[in-house]
Amino acid sequence: MEYLIGIQGPDYVLVASDRVAASNIVQMKDDHDKMFKMSEKILLLCVGEAGDTVQFAEYIQKNVQLYKMRNGYELSPTAAANFTRRNLADCLRSRTPYHVNLLLAGYDEHEGPALYYMDYLAALAKAPFAAHGYGAFLTLSILDRYYTPTISRERAVELLRKCLEELQKRFILNLPTFSVRVIDKDGIHNLENITFTKRSS
């Protein structure tokens, strides 16, 4: 019922997530942040079972920060993605698996921007664009049609809005507000939330 999306540009990664926290068919909150700051230039987006998402994301977050304190430098997005995948895979084979779907976005001085897609079975893939949730079925075709590797930030935001408008039109559930952030060489930046008003019938 949740939705995550990421778009990688030539020198940035644009990500967005819905802000609804739901329990079964009940909306509990409409201002829930599903993005977790791993380091100055790495962001983890996490959806899934309510308890699992926060517990797993915070566990990864604290371990990435511990790595920096021990070694004096931060993990690269690639290293953070592989560390996250390994932990998710280990938990999957234990008595306490986490049911979480993830996007990891980051920027590295040497490798540039990176976007990683990971599902609850710990399958990891580097992708130019990615989405999680039922909304992904409705928007991946739009991303495939309009995405280019050299897409500018302005065009990426337009493409993001096009995807979210498609969700409002075709998705039966109400996801009215989305958090939007950009990761680039200067760090993580908050963009203005994208909000849709309910259509009157």
Swiss-Prot record:
<dbReference type="Pfam" id="PF00227">
    <property type="entry name" value="Proteasome"/>
</dbReference>
<dbReference type="GO" id="GO:0005654">
    <property type="term" value="C:nucleoplasm"/>
</dbReference>
<keyword id="KW-0963">Cytoplasm</keyword>
<comment type="function">
    <text>Non-catalytic component of the 20S core proteasome complex involved in the proteolytic degradation of most intracellular proteins. This complex plays numerous essential roles within the cell by associating with different regulatory particles. Associated with two 19S regulatory particles, forms the 26S proteasome and thus participates in the ATP-dependent degradation of ubiquitinated proteins.</text>
</comment>
<keyword id="KW-0007">Acetylation</keyword>
<dbReference type="InterPro" id="IPR035206">
    <property type="entry name" value="Proteasome_beta2"/>
</dbReference>
<dbReference type="InterPro" id="IPR001353">
    <property type="entry name" value="Proteasome_sua/b"/>
</dbReference>
<dbReference type="GO" id="GO:0000502">
    <property type="term" value="C:proteasome complex"/>
</dbReference>
<comment type="similarity">
    <text>Belongs to the peptidase T1B family.</text>
</comment>
<keyword id="KW-0647">Proteasome</keyword>
<dbReference type="GO" id="GO:0005829">
    <property type="term" value="C:cytosol"/>
</dbReference>
<dbReference type="InterPro" id="IPR029055">
    <property type="entry name" value="Ntn_hydrolases_N"/>
</dbReference>
<feature type="modified residue" description="N-acetylmethionine">
    <location>
        <position position="1"/>
    </location>
</feature>
<dbReference type="InterPro" id="IPR016050">
    <property type="entry name" value="Proteasome_bsu_CS"/>
</dbReference>
<dbReference type="GO" id="GO:0005839">
    <property type="term" value="C:proteasome core complex"/>
</dbReference>
<keyword id="KW-0539">Nucleus</keyword>
<dbReference type="GO" id="GO:0019774">
    <property type="term" value="C:proteasome core complex, beta-subunit complex"/>
</dbReference>
<protein>
    <recommendedName>
        <fullName>Proteasome subunit beta type-2</fullName>
    </recommendedName>
</protein>
<dbReference type="GO" id="GO:0043161">
    <property type="term" value="P:proteasome-mediated ubiquitin-dependent protein catabolic process"/>
</dbReference>
<comment type="subunit">
    <text>The 26S proteasome consists of a 20S proteasome core and two 19S regulatory subunits. The 20S proteasome core is a barrel-shaped complex made of 28 subunits that are arranged in four stacked rings. The two outer rings are each formed by seven alpha subunits, and the two inner rings are formed by seven beta subunits. The proteolytic activity is exerted by three beta-subunits PSMB5, PSMB6 and PSMB7.</text>
</comment>
<dbReference type="GO" id="GO:0005737">
    <property type="term" value="C:cytoplasm"/>
</dbReference>
<dbReference type="GO" id="GO:0005634">
    <property type="term" value="C:nucleus"/>
</dbReference>
<dbReference type="InterPro" id="IPR023333">
    <property type="entry name" value="Proteasome_suB-type"/>
</dbReference>
